[in-house]
């Protein structure tokens, strides 16, 4: 892809932002080399690797890049067989450590997780744990060799510490002896040797070697003769220490050289991973998504935002083309909004084709273009001279000579810089030529001739950037299908141009042109209203979906509680049955004991009969426990819309809303809720025969439950209260209650109003009223049931 378009569309600024999320200079170099990939397979692969990195960050936290360095210089020296500096060895050890930790990071995946591309990259990591351990045992930091590097080094340093202690004892003794001759009662070190600060006039009184003097010459730094041998011994130990350190560095450098291929490979992998995860972090910061890339050059970007404009101020834009039209003409006043739309579209494509997430809604679609041409400049200047026109025409000629059906072409103020009539004619001809060869074109202009061209030409569509005449500013909302209006008269009027001048100007314009502009304004106003209605509908739709999801979850939880209660009741019933049987057996055993003791067998016979009757009755109850749920109504083979059926698991009648689908799922209305159940769970409603006595029907459905005469809704929201009330009224009706009390509290009256609205249409409610004095007043509603 041509470098000029990458520069004009500010892709380099995007890459500068991306670099902030890398850890190494090597990864920054990969960012510098980033540009759109040459084939769609590579684009999709690199987008997928970015998505995998984002999922890994979300599921496992940030990857282990701590302490990772750019070791290219050290690797290069090791390849030549050079002895490396401690810092270079330490950093290579950090790369080996990061490689090992990253392999562990990738392997620790959960069930069902898969990261194909990143796992494949990490397959190339070869662990060198032995060398890694040896490096970190030998080198504590970038400038310090550890005492543990070798036993010889440890012993040498111990000897140095001992000698230093001896020297300090000796020098402190000398300070006490020579204190009257010294500038200060302390020692210092010059060239690794202990010296005393002697006043110049006393140098003959302190025998020794002069190593230095102060800038004023008043102080001489003398090494007393008594310290010479001790200092010499320390110097010898220091030389031995250096020789041992050189040997250790040589051994480590040699081992690094022997494994340099593996080390370089591991380093390359870590830098590549650093680059990939930087893309994911950058995309996350943009609140971006992975776009869909298609080979048909279809564009459908939803709520796309320019990545370099502050998220708090940028206005999202929707743009689509490639199906019904391939040429989009954006018209309107010269306010900057059109250019932003143009740059946003081009830059988002470059980002997507470079494997980056784009700041747009999920499932936004971009086309795979092998070239993106951009002729964008500051064409909103008062001066439109020949040199400007020539410059743009040179760019346009280059575009015409190199574009094809895989090209996205962006023109800013096409045809500007020359006579408007000629410029408009040239613009139409250029667009027509590029459209015929299959290129995707987006052009901004303020020429009315191009609006007319877009209206009457196949494959060409008008668009405009919404402009607020009241504030004299663009809203930056792109409106496809509506041509832009120049708003010159309105803007001039707002800025204070006299009305008589504006009126005279209007008279100089043909009436057809004015009508055309007025029609455009009317279309814009209608479009804005329609979009507002659509947004409101979308908000309501999302809220309704949230409420539906909330109460479906509540229904599931209620059913779980209900099932658990039934199961627990069954368990307790079976426990009572078991204990009763055991008690009966114990009674029989006691009777036998009494019989052995001479008591009448008639007593035994009578009690045994009673025991048998108890056992039969208990067994019957136990059998009913297992049959109750499955035999609660006749199984249905089919249902129809509007039919009333019974769900045993809910112990509730429901209304069928749809026929069974291919999986046997039926949508039903249960109170205020719509739920899906399988046809197998539906039964014919109990007591459905017309001649069945109403009271008996209620008693049959009562199911031995005790229903309270009131329900307390205080503290609930309106929707939850309506659901609880609906269920309570069902239970109260089935239980045969004639009058119940709904406690909703006084508060703001919102809850009472919600309940009143529900009661108006409830099938079980005969009448209702606000509570009187002594009943709870306006804090309760008294309901009379049918």
Swiss-Prot record:
Q: Name one Pfam family in it.
A: MSSS
The residues covered by the Smr domain are 711-786
* Family annotation (SUPFAM superfamilies): DNA repair protein MutS, domain III, P-loop containing nucleoside triphosphate hydrolases, SMR domain-like
Asked whether the keyword Disulfide bond is assigned, the reply is no
In short, the EC number is 3.1.-.-, 3.6.4.-
- Keyword annotations from UniProtKB, A to Z: ATP-binding, DNA-binding, Endonuclease, Hydrolase, Nuclease, Nucleotide-binding, RNA-binding, rRNA-binding
DNA-binding keyword on record:
yes
Q: Which GO terms describe its molecular function?
A: ATP binding; ATP hydrolysis activity; ATP-dependent DNA damage sensor activity; endonuclease activity; mismatched DNA binding; ribosomal large subunit binding; rRNA binding
One Gene Ontology term of the biological-process aspect is: rescue of stalled ribosome
Which sites bind ATP? Answer: 332-339
**Catalytic EC class:** hydrolase
Record's function text: Endonuclease that is involved in the suppression of homologous recombination and thus may have a key role in the control of bacterial genetic diversity. Acts as a ribosome collision sensor, splitting the ribosome into its 2 subunits. Detects stalled/collided 70S ribosomes which it binds and splits by an ATP-hydrolysis driven conformational change. Acts upstream of the ribosome quality control system (RQC), a ribosome-associated complex that mediates the extraction of incompletely synthesized nascent chains from stalled ribosomes and their subsequent degradation. Probably generates substrates for RQC.
**Hey, which family's this protein in?**
Belongs to the DNA mismatch repair MutS family. MutS2 subfamily.
Q: How does it assemble?
A: Homodimer. Binds to stalled ribosomes, contacting rRNA.
- NCBIfam families reported for this sequence: mutS2
Q: What is this protein called?
A: Endonuclease MutS2
């Amino acid at each position: 892809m041509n470098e000029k378009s990458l520069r004009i569309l500010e892709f380099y600024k995007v890459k500068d932002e991306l670099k902030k999320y890398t850890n190494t200079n090597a990864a920054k170099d990969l960012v510098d080399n980033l540009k759109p990939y040459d084939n769609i397979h590579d684009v999709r692969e690199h987008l997928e690797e970015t998505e995998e990195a984002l999922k890994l960050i979300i599921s496992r936290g940030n990857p282990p890049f701590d302490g990772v360095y750019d070791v290219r210089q050290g690797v290069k020296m090791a390849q030549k067989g050079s002895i490396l500096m401690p810092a270079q060895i330490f950093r290579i050890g950090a790369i080996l450590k990061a490689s090992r930790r990253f392999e562990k990071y990738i392997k620790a995946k959960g069930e069902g997780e898969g990261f194909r591309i990143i796992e494949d990259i990490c397959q190339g990591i070869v662990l060198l744990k032995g060398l890694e351990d040896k490096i970190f045992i030998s080198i504590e930091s970038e400038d310090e060799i550890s005492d543990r590097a070798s036993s010889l080094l440890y012993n040498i340093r111990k000897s140095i510490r001992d000698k230093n202690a001896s020297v300090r004892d000796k020098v402190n003794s000398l300070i006490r002896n020579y204190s009257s001759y010294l500038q200060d009662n302390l020692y210092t070190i010059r060239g690794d040797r202990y010296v005393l600060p002697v006043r110049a006039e006393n140098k003959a009184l302190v025998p020794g070697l002069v190593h230095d003097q102060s800038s004023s010459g008043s102080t001489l730094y003398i090494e007393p003769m008594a310290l010479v041998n001790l200092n010499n011994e320390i110097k010898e130990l220091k030389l031995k220490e250096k020789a041992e350190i050189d040997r250790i560095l040589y051994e480590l450098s040699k081992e690094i050289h022997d494994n340099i291929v593996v080390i370089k490979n591991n380093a390359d992998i870590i830098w590549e991973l650093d680059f990939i995860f930087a893309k994911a972090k950058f995309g996350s910061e943009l609140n971006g998504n992975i776009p869909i890339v298609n080979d048909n050059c279809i564009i459908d970007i939803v709520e796309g935002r320019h990545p370099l404009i502050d998220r708090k101020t940028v206005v999202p834009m929707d743009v689509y083309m490639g199906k019904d039209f391939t040429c989009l003409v954006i018209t309107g006043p010269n306010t900057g909004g059109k250019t932003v739309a143009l740059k946003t579209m081009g830059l988002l494509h470059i980002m997507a084709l470079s494997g980056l997430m784009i700041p747009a809604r999920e499932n936004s679609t971009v086309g795979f273009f092998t070239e993106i041409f951009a002729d964008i400049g500051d064409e909103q200047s008062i001066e439109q001279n020949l040199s400007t026109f020539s410059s743009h025409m040179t760019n346009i000629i280059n575009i015409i000579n190199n574009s094809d059906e895989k090209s996205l072409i962006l023109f800013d103020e096409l045809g500007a810089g020359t006579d408007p009539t000629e410029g408009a004619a040239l613009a139409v001809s250029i667009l027509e030529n590029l459209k015929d060869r299959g290129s995707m074109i987006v052009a901004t202009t303020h020429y009315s001739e191009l609006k007319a061209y877009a209206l009457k030409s196949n494959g060409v569509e008008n668009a405009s950037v919404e402009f607020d005449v009241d504030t004299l500013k663009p809203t930056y909302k792109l409106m496809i299908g509506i041509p832009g209006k120049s708003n010159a008269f309105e803007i001039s009027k707002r800025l204070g141009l006299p009305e008589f001048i504006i009126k005279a100007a209007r008279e100089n314009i043909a009436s057809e042109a004015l009508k055309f502009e007025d029609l455009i304004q009317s279309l814009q106003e209608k479009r804005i209203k329609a979009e507002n209605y659509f947004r409101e509908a979308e908000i309501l739709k999302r809220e309704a979906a949230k409420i539906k999801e909330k109460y479906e979850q509540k229904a599931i939880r209620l059913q779980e509680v209900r099932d658990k209660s039934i199961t627990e009741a069954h368990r307790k019933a079976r426990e009572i049955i078991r204990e009763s049987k055991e008690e009966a057996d114990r009674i029989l055993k006691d009777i036998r004991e009494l019989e052995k003791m001479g008591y009448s067998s008639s007593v035994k016979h009578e009690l045994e009969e009673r025991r048998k009757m108890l056992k039969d009755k208990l067994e019957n109850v136990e059998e009913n426990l297992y049959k109750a749920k499955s035999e609660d109504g006749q199984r249905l083979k089919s249902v129809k819309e509007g039919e009333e059926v019974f769900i045993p698991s809910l112990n509730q009648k429901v209304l069928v809303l749809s026929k069974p689908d291919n999986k046997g799922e039926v949508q039903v209305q249960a109170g205020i809720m719509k739920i899906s159940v399988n046809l197998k769970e539906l039964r014919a409603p109990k007591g459905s025969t017309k001649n069945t006595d109403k009271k008996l029907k209620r008693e049959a459905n009562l199911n031995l439950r005790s229903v309270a005469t009131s329900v307390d809704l205080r503290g609930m929201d309106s929707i939850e209260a309506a659901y609880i009330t609906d269920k309570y009224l069902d239970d109260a009706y089935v239980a045969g209650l004639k009058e119940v009390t709904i406690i909703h509290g006084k508060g703001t009256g919102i809850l009472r109003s919600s309940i009143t609205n529900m009661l108006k249409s409830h099938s079980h409610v005969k009448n209702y009223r606000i509570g009187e004095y002594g009943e709870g007043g306006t804090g309760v509603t008294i309901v009379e049931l049918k």
